[in-house]
Amino acid sequence: MGEKGHLSRVLLECSLSDKLCVVREKQYEVIIVPALLVGGFLILLAIILWLFIRGQRSQRQSPGPRGTASVPASRGRSQEAAGHGEKVLLPLKETSVEGFLRAATPRLAKLQVPREQLLEVLEQIHSGSCGTLYHATMTTKDHPKPKSVVLKALEDPVGLQEVQDFIGRIQFYQYLGKHKNLVQLEGCCTERLPLYMMLEDVVPGDLLSFLWTCRRDVMTMDGLLYDLTEKQIYHIGKQILLALEFLQEKHLFHGDVAARNILIQSDLTPKLCHLGLAYEVHAHGAISSARSSTIPLKWLAPERLLLRPASIRGDIWSFGILLYEMVTLGAPPYPEVPPTSILQYLQRKKIMKRPSSCSHAMYNIMKCCWRWSEDSRPLLGQLLQRLEAASRSADDKAVLQVPELVVPELYADVAGIRAESISYSFSVL
């Protein structure tokens, strides 16, 4: 207090013996200390406000990620990535259909087909929310001879969201690349509306219709084309597993493995199609609840019925159902169980009985696919080994025979699927 008191006395011009000055000195100290504290607080507050305003200005001036989605640094790099099957994302800032197509089309340059090379639209196959399917013929520089394709068209009037989704699906095929057991993209026309996506045409068509035709052939004895043996079922099944392995390598799964979602060539080479669920996983990281609700319940694994996240283990369960479909020549699964009761049926630890046309070896493979716990089901590689081992001793002579013909409407009711979904023989995206 001595040095501070002396200083305050000097400021007040007081003598050491002045009693009144001592009182004034105390009053002075009471005033100056709070004043200094308030002043310091105001200076600190001003500095904080200045730093905040400065940060806000710099944030507004610097270009942020809003309105874009991982746009590559250079256009040349984007085109190079697209050519090598890498994931290429498009700018989202375009607010018009025309602007979006101008930005998207250069990145799909290697897939573009001049419209004049689309020679003929033969017939409409199906019309749905994601576009209309047609049979068409086209030529390319590599294939000057006309070839049949399935053309998917997105026609006016259409909004920006639908256009972005259509282009996204083309990009998804580009990202996947080629695999002999997946339906291939043949080209596209995206510089203006209507937009076209051309996919390979697979004859005779979808596997479910093929299996039903095998029944008719047995009834009428019309030749050998549609004769199917146990060994051929293993042949088809192994190739479907290879397609699923290919998807898994890209961190994807199919989500709806079924005979209706497989196309078959005349040499019995299967092509997995209807990749819409895999596209959703690729684009959004998960399957939307709206899309999940459209999948027939009888093909779903228990965890899917319980609304748990989908995975490749669910595809393994569905693969067991596919084997059942093939060995019964297209019978609906769980024929005695209503679709809405399938979860309760499985919760009682019940599975389908062995069909009379099914060997014990094949039924054992089905049962390991239908284990309740997804972790106890075999991996794709293990399942492939089981099929290869079983096929070595499989019957290649006896033709599978199921004399009853299928009525599609009755089948749809028992299987729990929409009748219109099996009214045409092509299932593509």
Swiss-Prot record:
Keyword RNA-binding: no
Main localization, broad class: membrane
GO molecular function: ATP binding; non-membrane spanning protein tyrosine kinase activity
Free-text function comment from the UniProt entry: Probable tyrosine protein-kinase, which has strong transforming capabilities on a variety of cell lines including NIH 3T3 fibroblasts and on athymic nude mice. When overexpressed, it can also induce tumor cell invasion as well as metastasis in distant organs. May act by activating both MAP kinase and phosphatidylinositol 3'-kinases (PI3K) pathways.
Binding site for ATP: 125-133, 152
Tissues where this protein is expressed: Highly expressed in colon and small intestine. Weakly or not expressed in spleen, skeletal muscle, liver, kidney, heart and brain. Expressed in transformed kidney cell lines (COS-1 and HEK293T).
Positions annotated as active site in the UniProt record: 256
Residue ranges, annotated region (Disordered): 58-83
Protein name: Tyrosine-protein kinase STYK1
Membrane topology term: Single-pass membrane protein
EC number of the protein: 2.7.10.2
Localisation per UniProt entry: Membrane
Protein family (similarity comment): Belongs to the protein kinase superfamily. Tyr protein kinase family.
